[in-house]
């Protein structure tokens, strides 16, 4: 697929409102970088479709790992992790702009109008190696590669203030409707929902910097999370986690907000609207589970039993775990069985 076909699929077939192109930097030539910038400028239509220029900084995990770089404007410099697969000597003239470690990347991006997100692909991001709170505003929790709650735990343990995003990364040119099929990728691609007052770059970048967004594993559920305080709270304007200034005093905060609160307790409100019935809602404070809410009782289940096999054994490219197994019951019978969350059609129940 061409880059134009890629963008048009996301806009016209997957019905995305916001998207970007995140090619591996070591494969992006100078001419292709200019082509991508022309495309995003052409396709970006405030109020209709937000198309963001950017690239994937694709370094090995040992020097920081993959990062998604999103520029607010076209014409910015691409700071590659390397020129590894760029063969044309004329494309080596900007080699001094390369950033070979995540720390160097943040240095070169300092002062630029951009947002960085920690990406979990083949070379997963190590946010304990390097992190800049003024630039890196979010971590990726789900994509075609799977689900990575561990990177959220890493961030919380380090005291980072981060948002959570989900992406496609299916390598098949189907952003927003990315299914793995018979392939190495084991999951449906993720989506990010932005809480923004308008559909334009300014509003979306403000949402990214204030972490006003959430991720899903590909469904389009609606999630409204807020906190009400009894006393006035000092809401802080933020720039990638860095407190910049206080705004007017408020008594309601939404996801991603930072505020100085004097109350000993606050009221948490969570509204979830799913495309299917909700199984449960886990509420964490940092990395600690403090409440598990189920919208049903045992009698509602009838004779159904749910068996879940999940998880990964490794953080890197070979993270996919083969969950082959069997189930046998004594003194009873299995009337019917069906799979859930299984996207590879060549796998599943062989016999029953």
Question: What kind of feature is each model-predicted range?
Answer:
Residues 1-111:
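A metal-dependent hydrolase metal-coordination microenvironment
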Residues 17-23, 50-54, 68-70, 115-118, ...:
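Structural recognition of the beta-strand scaffold that forms the well-ordered cores
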Residues 24-26, 56-58, 121-122, 145, ...:
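Catalytic metal-binding/acid-base residues of hydrolase active sites
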Residues 38-40, 124-130, 135-137, 149-352:
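C-terminal functional module detector
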Residues 54-55, 72, 119-121, 143-145, ...:
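Fold-independent oxyanion-binding glycine-rich loops
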Residues 101-151:
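Glycine/proline-rich, flexible active-site/cofactor-binding loop segments
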């Amino acid at each position: 697929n061409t880059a134009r076909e890629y963008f048009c699929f996301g806009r016209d077939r997957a019905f995305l409102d916001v998207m970007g192109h995140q090619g591996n930097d070591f494969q992006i030539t100078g001419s292709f970088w200019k082509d991508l910038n022309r495309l995003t400028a052409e396709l970006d239509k405030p109020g209709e479709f937000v198309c963001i220029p950017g690239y994937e900084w694709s370094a090995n995990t040992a020097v920081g790992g993959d990062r998604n770089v999103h520029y607010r404007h076209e014409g910015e410099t691409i700071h590659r992790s390397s020129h590894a697969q760029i063969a044309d000597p004329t494309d080596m003239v900007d080699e001094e702009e390369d950033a070979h470690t995540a720390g160097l990347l943040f240095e070169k991006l300092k002062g630029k109008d951009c947002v960085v997100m920690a990406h979990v692909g083949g070379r997963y991001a190590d946010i304990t190696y390097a992190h800049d709170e003024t630039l890196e505003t979010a971590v990726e929790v789900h994509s075609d590669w799977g689900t990575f709650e561990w990177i959220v735990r890493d961030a919380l343990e380090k005291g980072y203030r981060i948002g959570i995003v989900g992406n496609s990364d299916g390598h098949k040119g189907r952003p927003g409707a990315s299914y793995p099929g018979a392939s190495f990728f084991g999951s449906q691609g993720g989506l990010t929902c932005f809480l923004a007052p308008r559909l334009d770059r300014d509003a979306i970048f403000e949402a990214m910097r204030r972490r006003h967004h959430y991720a899903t594993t590909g469904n389009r559920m609606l999630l409204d999370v807020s906190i009400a305080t009894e006393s006035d709270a000092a809401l802080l304007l933020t720039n990638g986690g860095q407190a910049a200034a206080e705004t007017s005093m408020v008594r309601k905060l939404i996801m991603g907000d930072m505020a100085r609160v004097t109350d000993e307790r606050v009221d948490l409100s969570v509204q979830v609207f799913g495309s299917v019935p909700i199984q449960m809602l886990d509420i964490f404070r940092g990395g600690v589970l403090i409440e598990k809410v189920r919208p049903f009782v045992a009698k509602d289940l009838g004779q159904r039993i749910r068996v879940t096999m999940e998880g990964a054994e490794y953080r890197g490219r070979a993270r996919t775990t083969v969950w082959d197994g069997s189930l046998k019951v004594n003194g009873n019978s299995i009337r019917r069985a069906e799979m859930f969350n299984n996207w590879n059609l060549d796998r599943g129940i062989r016999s029953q």
